[in-house]
Design a protein with these regions (language model features):
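Conserved short hydrophobic patches within well-ordered secondary structure
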Residues: 2, 58, 201-202
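A short, polar/proline- and glycine-enriched secondary-structure boundary/capping micro-motif
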Residues: 77, 109-113, 122-123, 130-132, ...
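Gly/Pro-enriched, hydrophobic low-complexity segments
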Residues: 42-45, 69, 104, 119-120, ...
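N-terminal mature ectodomain segment of secretory-pathway/periplasmic proteins
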Residues: 42-127
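Bacterial N-terminal signal peptides
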Residues: 8-18
Length: 267
């Protein structure tokens, strides 16, 4: 099917008026033009300040549950993009209690950390692996990636406000304007840093992120990860939320230490 280009009437009239003038001046030498370099986007202080306030809020939370409904694009060898959907639920109780459940189109995984033991559970296959481990939630997220090759979805939630996500890494920052996510009044921000464009919608009342869009600029097709977040910062979390108890048909396996680049536990 051929593609049709439809131009506004006003633009057609303008082109008709300009055409004779262009014909009359066709014999004149054309001045050599120099391409103008696109201006470098600025770092707006108000945008960086909003990110800083959000990071402080995240680091101040002592106990919370957050659910992210997400889509992730994967680029095939053909250059085509496939979109996968899923969700992840985090339950966190500072300083050292962690639970994550990942349920995507391709896999299910649960992660438990009770302050002394880290468990990875694959409910569909009924396999689980455990390792003794101590430290804070932030240390767990880092260890899971660096030692076992498990990169938690939305790991930035645990890194904002720490030296792993310094504000100095932001190369441009723009306040797009007000927006609403699931009826929550937000400020919409656009950021750029090396290899990544990302957008965040921050709730005006709670200062918590309500939506994230992350574009990978290292890939020419710029695949995106999109997540909408729902927060609960008031419901209490029990110790049992962070401890794994195997069922009769669950089987233990060993955790292999990382021998290859980390793969994100999609979504």
């Amino acid at each position: 099917m051929s593609r049709q280009w439809i131009l506004p009437v006003g633009l057609l009239v303008a082109m008709a008026c300009v055409a004779p003038v262009m014909a009359q001046e066709a014999h004149k030498p054309v001045a050599q033009s120099h391409p103008q370099q696109a201006p470098t986007p600025a770092v707006e202080p108000s945008a960086v300040h909003a990110i800083d306030l959000m990071a402080q809020k995240l680091r101040s939370l002592k106990s919370f549950t957050v659910r992210a409904d997400a889509t992730m694009e994967e680029v095939l060898d053909t250059g085509q993009k496939v979109t996968y959907g899923g969700n992840v639920t985090y339950k966190i109780r500072a300083p050292d209690k962690f639970f994550a459940a990942v349920d995507s189109d391709r896999k299910q995984r649960s992660f438990y950390y009770d302050g002394s033991k880290f468990t990875i559970y694959a409910p569909r296959m009924h396999y689980y692996a455990q390792k003794p481990l101590t430290g804070t939630v932030h240390q767990l997220v880092a260890t899971a990636q660096e030692k076992y090759g498990v990169e938690m979805p939305l790991a930035d939630l645990f890194y904002w406000g720490t030296d792993k996500a310094p504000l100095s890494a932001i190369e441009s920052a723009t306040v797009i304007g007000p927006a609403r996510i699931n009826k929550v009044e937000c400020d919409h921000l656009l950021m750029h840093q090396s290899g990544v464009d990302w957008q965040v919608w921050i709730a005006r009342d709670t200062l918590l992120p309500q939506k994230l869009v992350i574009a990978n600029l290292d890939d020419p097709t710029q695949p995106e990860y999109v997540a909408t977040l729902t927060w609960d910062t008031t419901s209490p979390l029990a110790d049992s939320d962070f401890s794994f108890t195997p069922k009769a048909d669950d089987h233990p396996i060993k955790i292999s230490e990382r021998a290859a680049p980390a793969k994100e536990a999609s979504p």
